Regions:
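Bacterial N-terminal signal peptides that target proteins for export
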Residues: 2-11
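Hydrophobic h-region of N-terminal signal peptides that target proteins for export
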Residues: 15-23
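Compositionally biased, proline/threonine/alanine/serine-rich low-complexity intrinsically disordered stretches
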Residues: 23-49
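Hydrophobic, proline/glycine-rich low-complexity stretches
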Residues: 39-70
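Solvent-exposed helix/loop surface patches that form functional interfaces
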Residues: 47-50, 64, 116-222
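Short, small/polar residue-rich loop motifs at catalytic or cofactor-binding pockets
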Residues: 50-51, 93-94, 208-209, 232-234
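N-terminal mature ectodomain segment of secretory-pathway/periplasmic proteins
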Residues: 58-138, 244-251
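C-terminal structured interaction module
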Residues: 232-263
Length: 263
């Protein structure tokens, strides 16, 4: 069993509860909603930022893309937003926005590309399916593709590394538990069903806690917690800072000579 400190784990749970924790007591929620109904109508709750920042995406040591992201809680749901901008002269811009409920249920996912081509994707749940609608500049009517997947399936879209951070938090909360003053994670990798909207495909991925590593981040040596993310045809290494809310700090994709580093 892999261990992480219980003290640091508490912070991860606080962050994660906004994303996939079980709903609170229904009677208490009903009473609270009744008492505060008029106040809520008059003034929506202010958004609380869980994490925000940017990742630099490097290929063969050269920065090629910057991802700017935020994770916010507001009005009972969490919203994960991200923007990709290319550093090359040929502009490439993409945005994504994902809203999920406290029980992990997907409300809506949107992806848009404004340059060099105009296209968009929307994913929403419908009964036992996730429905993806794809719009391109070449088509006047959106194409629709259903996926037989639970509405709690995670979105892992191409190049949006903040989605990987949310998946890590889900893994830490679901597959680790306190024991003997420490948090222990299951030894075998945990499997998750995910949807990759840009590729119009679903897949199974595996996450596994490896342990502590000493690595260089921006020229300084850091001791970070390493996890492996793998699936059919890929194997990534991810490092999170267990002393700072389990934030994703670095990703290594050796097969593509790619590295992702938090700015």
């Amino acid at each position: 069993m892999k261990r992480i400190s219980e003290r640091r784990w508490g912070t991860a749970i606080v962050l994660f509860c906004a994303l996939v924790a079980h709903a609170g007591d229904k009677n208490q929620d009903r009473d609270r909603n009744k008492d505060n109904k008029e106040k809520a109508k008059a003034k929506p709750a202010a958004a609380q930022t869980v994490d925000s920042g940017s990742f630099g995406i490097f290929v063969k040591g050269q920065r090629v893309v910057t991802e700017t992201f935020s994770i916010q809680q507001q009005n009972g749901s969490s919203v994960i937003k991200s923007e990709l901008k290319s550093t090359s002269t040929a502009a490439h811009e993409q945005t994504s926005a994902m809203e999920i409920m406290p029980n992990g249920q997907l409300v809506r996912y949107e992806w848009d590309e404004t340059s060099p081509a105009v296209s968009s994707v929307v994913v929403t749940p419908s009964n036992e399916f996730l429905i993806e609608k794809i719009t391109t500049s070449a088509s006047s009517k959106p194409a629709e593709q259903p996926f037989l997947m639970p509405n709690t399936s995670m979105i892992l879209d191409n190049n949006f590394f903040v989605h990987r951070e949310v998946l890590l938090w889900r893994y830490l909360a679901a597959d680790c538990h306190p024991e003997g003053g420490h948090m222990q994670c299951q030894k075998e990798p945990a499997e998750f069903g995910v949807l990759v909207p840009q590729d119009r495909t679903s897949m199974r991925v595996r996450l596994e806690l490896v342990g502590k590593d000493k690595i260089n981040v921006h020229g300084a040596q850091r001791e970070l917690m390493r996890l492996n993310l793998s699936g059919d045809g890929f194997n990534w290494q991810l490092w999170v800072d267990d002393s700072d809310q389990f934030k994703l700090m670095r990703v290594a994709i050796p097969a593509d000579n790619t590295e992702v580093v938090r700015d």
